[in-house]
Amino acid sequence: MDGGATAGDHLVVFTPSGKRGRVPHGTTVLDAARRLGVDLDSVCGGRGICSKCQCSPGAGDFPKHGLTVGPDALSPRNAVEARYDRVRGLAADRRLGCQAIVQGDVLIDVPPESQVHRQVVRKAASDRAVTADPAVRAYVVAVEEPDMDAPSGDLERLRAALARDHGLDGLTVPLQVLTGLQGALRRGGWTVTVAVDAETGVVAAVWPGARDAALLGLAVDLGSTTIAAHLCDLSDGAVLASGGVMNPQIRFGEDLMSRVSYAMMNPGGTAEMTGAVRGALDALAGELCAEAGRDRGDVVDAAIVCNPVMHHLLLGIDPSELGQAPFALAAGDAQRLGAAELGLALAPGARAYLLPCIAGHVGADAAAVALAEAPDAADAVTLVVDVGTNAELILVDRRGLLACSSPTGPAFEGAQISAGQRAAPGAIERVRIDPDTKRARVRVIGCEAWSDEPGFDAAVTGICGSGIIEAVAEMRLAGLMDPSGLIGSAEATGCADCVPEGRTHAYRLWSDGTRDVMVTQTDVRAIQLAKSALYAGARLLMDEAGVDAVDRVTLAGAFGAHISPVHAMVLGMIPDAPLDRVGSAGNAAGHGARMALCDRGARTRVEALVRRIRKVETAVAPRFQEHFVAANAIPHASDPFPHLGPLPRVAFGAGGGGGRRRRR
C-alpha cells in the first residue's frame, strides 16, 4: 500500500497526465482530480449539467501502472447521469466526474475536451512543396441512357463509358459506391464525375454532373502519444487544415510495450484499443473538414504513417508478437485498403494507404522520415533521430542505410517527471540558468516573454518535455549537477535553490511564492534513462556502420522540432557533431505522409527505400547495454564531445556535498 494509505483508500491513476494518488472511499472522480492536481474541467459546480467533467474509466489489468481495475471500481450511473444521457447523450464508456464515486482502484482517462489546459499538439504541416500526382483522380464521363431494346445495368454502362473515354478498364465498384450510382446518374443528366484509384482500380466516389471542386486527401501521422493530420487538396498538395489530438490509447499505457501487455493480458484488449484509435482519427477527420468548410465526402484518399504497434492496432491485429523475439510483423509491406475498413467515414469508397514498416520495432513513421529527408542522397554520414516515446533512428553513409528503435519511454514528453505535463499553455518549455547567480529564468507555452521580463504574467502549470531537457542540461552547464547526474547541495554549489529532498537534493526552477516547480533527483534519473537509450541506439548503428563519428544530425518529429540542439548535445542525447550541422526537420513523418498522399511516385520510392534499409535490433544486440550504461553520464562516460567545449568540472558525493574539482 502507498505510504499514508489506509484500508479505506483507493489508488486513482489519471491519464494522459500520469498523475496518481490515493483518495478515500466515496470520493467523486472530480474531487479526486482536484486533490491530485489533474486538469478536469467543471463549470456547473458538480451538478451534472455542464458535462465538462466527462471522463472514461478503464477496466482490466494495467501492468504499466501496477493496477487492476474491477467492474465496480466506480459507482453505477446515478439518476443525474441517466437524465443527462436521456437529454444530451452520454457515450457508453463515459462518466460524469462529478457524479462517479471511487469505490476501488481505478484508472481514469481525461479526454481532450474535458481538460482545462489541452495539450498543444505541435505538428504543423511542413511548408515544403510536394509533387501533385495523386493515386486518386477525377474523371468526367457521359453515360448512355438506359434503352429497353438494349438492356444493361447502369454500372455496366458506366464502366463502358470510362473504358471508352479514359481507357479505364476492369474497375471495381464497392457496394457503398454502387448504392448511390443510380441517383447520381439521374441527378447529373447522365453525366457524372468519378473518382478512381489508379493503383487498385477501385472507384472511390461518384458525383452527379461535371464536378469542379478539388478532391481531398488526409495525411496522417499516427503516433503513440498524439495523432496529427493534414487535410490536403490533391490537385496541388496544398494543406487546407491541420490538427491533432491526444491518442486515446494512452489510458492503456503510455509506451508501446504497455499496450502490447494490455492486449496480451486482457481479452478483447486489442479490439478496445483499435476502437479507441479509429474513433479518434475519424473525429479528427471530421474536425478538419469542418475547419476547411468541406464535406467529408470530398475526402477520397488517406496516407497513414505509424509505428509497428500502432500499425497493428489500427488494422485490428493483435500486437502480441511484437512484444517478444523475433518481433514478427503480421504484414510489413504497404497496405492499400478501403478507408471504411479503418472506421473512417469519408467518401463512400475512399481509399487508405499505409506506408510500409521497416521491421518489428521500426515502423512506417521512420520510413516516412527517410522518404521526406532523403538522407541517402547526402554525401555525409547522417543520423536522423525521430524523438518520441519510442525513438527511431536511421544512419546513412555511402554504403547504405541502417535503422533501429530505442525504447526511450515518455519522460521526454513530460511524463514520469514530478512537475511534468504534456505540452499545454502554462508549461515551462524553455530554461536558462545564469552560471554566476545560479538562478533560472523560464518561458512557458502561450507567453513569449521570459519570467524575468515585463509582460510575463502566465500561470505556470508545470514543465513539458523540451523544458525538462533544457533544465537538466542547464543545470549541468551551471555546475549544479555533476557528470553522474547528481544534484549538489546549496553549500557545494553556492546556490540557495538547491534544497534537500530526502537523502538527495532538488533544484528550484521556478516559484511564485506559493508553488514551486522543482527538478528532483528522480526527474534527472528519468531523463538519464531516456537519453541513454537514445544514445545507445545511435552508437549501435555507428558500430554496425564502422564509423566513430557522424557529420550531421537531424532531429525529426514534432518533439524534435522543439529540442535545442546544444542542450540535446550537453545532455548526451545525440553523438557529438558540429552544432551548425545539428538541425530540426520538423514533423518529417507527417511530411512523408503528405508526399505519399499526393504523389504516386513517392509511394514507389518509399517501398523501394524500405527494402534497402538494414534493421538493427536493439533488444538483442550484445553491446546495447554496454552503450546504455556508458551513456548514463552527462554527456557521456567515455565518448568525446569536442564541439561542446569544456563543462564545469564538479563532483558531488552521495549526499550532494563536496564540490571538489575533478581533473580532466
Where are these regions (language model features)?
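Short glycine/threonine-rich loop-to-helix capping motif typified by GTGT followed
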Residues: 306-321, 396, 547-549, 558-578, ...
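Local cysteine-cluster metal-coordination motifs and their immediate loop/turn environment
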Residues: 39-105
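N-terminal phosphate-binding loop and adjacent alpha-helix
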Residues: 248-290, 416-417, 425-433, 526-529, ...
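Nucleotide/phosphate-binding catalytic cleft detector across ATP-hydrolyzing
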Residues: 78, 83-219, 224, 273-278, ...
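A contiguous, well-structured pocket-lining segment that forms one wall/lid of small-molecule binding clefts
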Residues: 476-543
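Glycine-rich phosphate-binding/hydrolytic loop that grips phosphoryl groups
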Residues: 357-372, 532, 582-619
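Glycine-rich phosphate-binding loop of actin/hexokinase-like ATP-binding domains
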Residues: 220-224, 229-257, 320-334, 368, ...
